[in-house]
């Protein structure tokens, strides 16, 4: 039964591990205990006795008697089992503890079916003898657990048991540590459980001890042995009949518990295999288990981030008031998708993405691909960050996106098209082919009945006569109308006589009443030459103020003045040509010879186009009066054809010249305006030139002042040098006089021939000094030694050569800054 006991101990250990939450530790302790690790010397002696008992052990069949339910064991096993009872008496039986855990504890503690501590399990396994198992146990794979009951002497004294219990409570501290994890013992709970089991054993199930201190067995252990079909009995005696009823109840209860144990065994087998692998590779050193914290995703900074100084208010963790004012849509709390949190997420994403590589342009498209939200809001946020230099500030200008525009087409040629009768407004361009001027002159000749202009004027006169003078039936009526012509002009005609379009009317219909033009009554042909001169003079003086012009004339109204001015011909055909008025040659074309230069030369009929243009600038009523005047002129010319005269119409020539001059006077204000503009331009130009001339003189004066200031400074410096030289001369002269007087005194005091060598040397030295002072007089300078003292470093060496020392002379920028400014310029 060695394998069976080993499995049973493993089951006890695994169940106990479920109670304390240390499955791996308890299984490792169990494996270490089975491997033969003993805690005390007593355990070593017991293991030696087990080996000796196994040698003499005989096979005992494990048979079950249904009637007596007794289990027999060989007599050779009794001493070994009795010796092991001392170690097992401090703990209750395995089956009793399991029953107590099942029926006396909560459901959460139902996994700990054996109620033993880890130390007791390991000790029981170490002290349990090896008992062979039968083939039935191996087939059913059920552990045969030996029941260890409490040991009592013949007098019923349990003092020895308490001593052993106290000793055993101290032993868990010496248990083996596997994989560096220390077991945690629970002496309080185990002691409580053992006390309860001992009380139940003493009251109910007192075992009977044979004279040789062998246990006949107790009820609970026997019931467990019957349930597992394999057990160990302490004596070959039978179970008392008084306990059969309790035995049957316990068997039924333990079967339900065994089912739970079987389900836990499958799980424990897997844990056992894992722990066996760990136990093989376990080291005696304690290992520490450390929790690995998840690594934070941080990217080291690889670029220097630069933002403009005016954006130092920006902070990634806060929202500034500038942002609230620039993008208020995120801070109104009206739109759920636009909140300050969403704004910070958008903003920080753009800023962080840009700062990963500040040399690359961060576009709006990149933000839209990675951030979900309003595209317009993202665009405004991107524009705001770019404006303040928070993004795209370090990007090279060559990498910035450029506006894609179509190529320029200014060099393309274009062709202008216009409707007929219109012309493009462009500068003068002479036509390639000149028109037929003779034909044009013939068309403009009003004296020729075949000309187009004559026909047009005649037709206009006919229509006008039909409107103003309807035909009458009798001559009397005509006479009355002629007498009362002024009255007819002021009334509206309601005549239904036939007019030019009367044929278009049906019977019973009348044409609309025609209104007479009131301006016709203002026409006055009684203009004298003095009145015309006053009119032209008034136009020259007052221009278009016709009230003043009429006042200047005196006896005419403003309307009459206007009509008379319009009746004046602009050009006269007698002013040009040979004076015969025919204009057959080219010299008689007059202004028409310049027709190709007019802007109407490209039209089909330039004459009519010119007339239409000029007529459009005048009041229609005025045009009508001018037409009437032209018709009257044509009739007078026709009547004069019969009277051929060789004399030239001098009066007409004079009148034409006056008209031309008056027209020029009328248009003089236009030329005056142009001249006034030209005068203003010339005046401004003259003022500008005078100002430039004045500025040039002032600049020249400033230069002269600077030059005079420089000369003054130079003169002051020369005066200072002269004064220094005078002082130096006086000083040197006094020194020379002193030396000379000293030499003379020496010579006079003693005769040179009789003097000693020392006196001669002194005289010689004084003479040499006198020579040196005469040859090289002392000079004052601006250096460190201005008076050339012998003990101070000077600019001369011992050989008399001057040495330039830069430290002796100050630079010009320090000594005279005003001169340095002029020289540097």
From Swiss-Prot:
Q: Point to the regions of Acidic residues compositional bias.
A: 195-206
Q: Name one GO cellular component term.
A: chromatin
Domain SANT stretches: 522-573
User: PTM Phosphothreonine: at which residues?
Assistant: 235
User: Some GO term, biological process aspect, for this entry: which one?
Assistant: positive regulation of DNA-templated transcription
Q: Composition bias, kind Polar residues: at what positions?
A: 1-13, 74-104, 117-138, 224-237
Q: Does the keyword Repeat apply?
A: no
Q: Which Gene Ontology molecular function entries are recorded, alphabetically? A: DNA binding; histone binding
Q: List the SUPFAM superfamilies.
A: Homeodomain-like
Where do the record's region annotations for Disordered lie? Answer: 1-285, 464-509
Chief subcellular location equals nucleus
Q: Which residues form the SWIRM domain?
A: 305-402
Annotated segments matching region Leucine-zipper: 694-722
Start-end of Low complexity biased regions: 22-42
Source domain of life: Eukaryota
The UniProt entry, under InterPro entries, shows: Homeodomain-like_sf, SANT/Myb, SANT_dom, SMARCC_C, SWIRM, WH-like_DNA-bd_sf
Which residues are annotated with the PTM Phosphoserine? 88, 185, 657
* Compartments where located: Nucleus
Q: Which UniProt keywords apply?
A: Activator, DNA-binding, Nucleus, Phosphoprotein, Transcription, Transcription regulation
Q: Where is the composition biased (Basic and acidic residues)?
A: 159-169, 180-194, 240-280
Q: Say yes or no: keyword Phosphoprotein present.
A: yes
Q: What else is known?
A: Present with 3150 molecules/cell in log phase SD medium.
User: What is the annotated role of this protein in its UniProt record?
Assistant: Involved in transcriptional activation. Component of the SWI/SNF complex, an ATP-dependent chromatin-remodeling complex, which is required for the positive and negative regulation of gene expression of a large number of genes. It changes chromatin structure by altering DNA-histone contacts within a nucleosome, leading eventually to a change in nucleosome position, thus facilitating or repressing binding of gene-specific transcription factors.
Its quaternary organisation is:
Interacts with RTT102, SWP82 and the N-terminus of SNF2. Component of the SWI/SNF global transcription activator complex. The 1.14 MDa SWI/SNF complex is composed of 11 different subunits: one copy each of SWI1, SNF2/SWI2, SNF5, SNF12/SWP73, ARP7/SWP61, ARP9/SWP59; two copies each of SWI3, SNF6, SNF11, SWP82; and three copies of TAF14/SWP29.
Report what the protein is called.
SWI/SNF complex subunit SWI3
Which taxonomic lineage does the organism of this UniProt entry have? Eukaryota, Fungi, Dikarya, Ascomycota, Saccharomycotina
Q: Which gene encodes it?
A: SWI3
